[in-house]
Each structure stands twice: as C-alpha cells, then as structure tokens.
C-alpha cells in the first residue's frame, strides 16, 4: 500500500552492477514476457485445486494507466464456507479490513461465500465513503452468487484491496467488473494463475501454490489446499503490504479454522520481512467449504487437527517465502534460524531483529561476512526474557545451500578464524541460512531450552531505493 496522490508506473530501471536478481517493477504483470527469467521457476505449471471453489479475474481499470489487464479478482465457493482471517495491526486500518472484520463477526465465521479483491487502490484513509465502497463490493458479489444481502451489514463476501493509500476507489468500474469476473468463474489451473496475477501490484510474478493430502480419519480421501498471495514491499510481521487467500475442501469448524490460521500465520506470514514497514490493508484469509466430505475437524484436540496444523503451517510458509523471493530489489533469500532458546517467542524476536537490520541486509547484499552486525542485532533485541542471550554461549554460523559444513563465525562468544574465500563463495549463492545457537550447542543444559524460531528475509540493494524513490510515498 502506498501513500496519497498518484500511482507511479515504474518501468525500465537501469541495471546496477551488483544487483543480479532484482528486476524492474511494474504496476501489474501484463504477460509472461514481463516475468523475469530468474522468477519463472516459482510459477507452477499445473495444480490440483479444492473442490467447490471457483476463481476469476476481470479488468476494471482501477488505475487509468491500466487499460487492459485484470485488476479485480473473485474467489467464490459453490457452498457456504467456514472462514477465518488475520488482519493488519496498523492503526489506520483500511475500509476493506474493517468491512471484512464486520462480515466475519456478524456471521461468526460461517456462511461465507468468498472474497473479492481489487489491486491499484488501497481504499485506505478514505472515510465513510470508502467504507460504503467496500460494502458495495461485498454486496455485489452476493448478488452475483444469487444470495443478495438484506442490507449492508449482512453480506457474506470478504473484501481486500491493495494499492495507493488515500484515494477513493473508482467504484462504478469495479462494480461493473464484478459480474464479468463472476461469469468467467472456473476451477482450471490457468484460471487460478490468472486470478493470482490480478491481485499483483509491484510483484514480478504471481504467487500461487496448491497441494493434495490425506487426514488420519480418512486415509483414502484426497483433500486439497490452494493459496495465492501478493506482496513485494512494505513487508513485515503482523501483516504488511500483503494479501493472501487460502482455500481448502476439508470440513472444519470456524473455531478450529481460526486456531489453525493463527498458528500457521505466526510461523509464516508473520515471520517474513522485506523492509520492516507495516501497512494498512493486509489480510490473510482461510476458507473451508467441506466439499471433499469426510469427518469434520471440530476441536483442536483431534488427530485430524494436529495433522492439518502441520500441513497448513508448512503450506503457509512456502507461500510466504514466495513473497520474500519477490522482495523489491532483492538479490538474496535468507533464512535465519535461532535455536536453543528458552522459548519460541524469544527465538522469533531475535530472528526478527536480525531480519530487520539494515546493516545486516546491506552487508549480505555486498557479500560481506560481517558477523558483527548479526551479533549486534542479537544483542539489542527487545522484549526477550532475562538470560535468553548469554554472550559466552552464543554461536553464529552460515549454513551453505549445497549441504557442506557450516562456516562457523562465532563459537561460544569467541570469534573464529573465518575463511574469507569460502565465505565469499557461500555469499555468491542466492540462498543462505544464518544459524544462531543461543546455547553454544549445549542443548538441554540447565537453563537452556530447545525452542527454535525461524524468519525469512531478503537483502537491501541499490534497486530497492530506486523503486521506492520513484514510487509515490
């Protein structure tokens, strides 16, 4: 989400010498040609999608500069769903966030028919008029579904928007596009992929995943999970410029669904960072229509719940990681793993602090094994329990992607003699893992725990500054 006045279409950035993977950014993705070659490997060539869900995109022209490409998306279920969502913690919550919260609260997470999304305008900080626009979008989808609402407070469709902050939606264009999208609803892979494209802004590729699985109570029954997300900048925990829609055909109660989503998001979408900014619109929604049948997941104590929690969390992590891989100007994908912590929460705080550090991010862009910056970030992490970080027990290393031995940088608070040539080779790779061991490898020692926290982030490049300097903020 970007701030007021105009949306700047950025094209044709000059390639900077040190940036090998960053790409020019456009308002939306027009066709396959515009997708960078290095990113095409992340786009699925096929998929299996949950029963009873239909999707489509349509062109509304939310931005005047967009004369042909889809910028309105629909995800609809043929039957009412259980639904849960996690929203931005930003105090200036956009109109679609407020309306979606109202829909879920009014219906207590049941009877939801789908989601409508527009890209190009955030409908944030737009007052009562913006709220009415979001409600009209929800009501229009209900009308197309043949279940018109009895009033603006009784809709069954969630609403999401992404784009420029402080501008009103061209609501007539969007309301005209919704029936067009609805008439094209389908369940093919190409339609899912096109719908994922329709929600993009500065993304360089559409982010879509799907998978099949079974559950303990129905080992011979195939279930499906699909998800799409968008985001490339203003990404930081507790939701940033990030939209995500996950759908499954497993029957799940609203309370169990909420618990599943909360657990998964805390370990996925709330464990990524690109630039540390938290925005106004961000929403991750999970819909379950039960179309595949089988025993419903009602409580959090069942074997099916435990299995679904593992499946959903892993899936959400994979989806969230695609956002980091598309970070604005990014040349690296970094995993930071903090282990041997007394608590998962403290491990995650430390990992988050490292991921947010501009000095760490710029050092990695420069291929500099400057472990002092990592150590500094560990040392100033806020809100962790006393005794979590003990300098004499702390170790830091780089874990290469080729499976070779870790490059130890710091062991039990003492610096290692770093092989700079090997460090340079490791830092040439796109992927890197930083391991922070708070127990000096002494897992189980009194006062230490075995808890772990993971975080995913990217580096800061010259191109990040170029993109955001040219994009009205």
UniProtKB/Swiss-Prot annotation:
BP GO annotations: L-arginine biosynthetic process; ornithine biosynthetic process
Catalytic reaction(s) noted: N(2)-acetyl-L-ornithine + L-glutamate = N-acetyl-L-glutamate + L-ornithine; L-glutamate + acetyl-CoA = N-acetyl-L-glutamate + CoA + H(+)
GO CC annotations, alphabetized: mitochondrial matrix
Major localization listed first in the record, in broad terms: mitochondrion
Pfam families in the cross-refs: ArgJ
Keywords: Acyltransferase, Amino-acid biosynthesis, Arginine biosynthesis, Autocatalytic cleavage, Mitochondrion, Multifunctional enzyme, Transferase
Family matches, as Gene3D superfamilies: arginine biosynthesis bifunctional protein suprefamily, ArgJ beta chain, C-terminal domain, L-amino peptidase D-ALA esterase/amidase
EC number: 2.3.1.35, 2.3.1.1
Keyword Cell inner membrane: no
Subcellular location per the Swiss-Prot or TrEMBL entry: Mitochondrion matrix
PTM statement from Swiss-Prot or TrEMBL: The alpha and beta chains are autoproteolytically processed from a single precursor protein within the mitochondrion.
Site location (Involved in the stabilization of negative charge on the oxyanion by the formation of the oxyanion hole): 162-163
Taxonomy, superkingdom: Eukaryota
Residues at the site labelled Cleavage: 240-241
Quaternary structure note: Heterodimer of an alpha and a beta chain.
PANTHER family recorded: ARGININE BIOSYNTHESIS BIFUNCTIONAL PROTEIN ARGJ, ARGININE BIOSYNTHESIS BIFUNCTIONAL PROTEIN ARGJ, MITOCHONDRIAL
Task of the protein: Catalyzes two activities which are involved in the cyclic version of arginine biosynthesis: the synthesis of acetylglutamate from glutamate and acetyl-CoA, and of ornithine by transacetylation between acetylornithine and glutamate.
Protein name, per record: Arginine biosynthesis bifunctional protein ArgJ, mitochondrial
Species for this entry: Ajellomyces capsulatus (strain G186AR / H82 / ATCC MYA-2454 / RMSCC 2432)
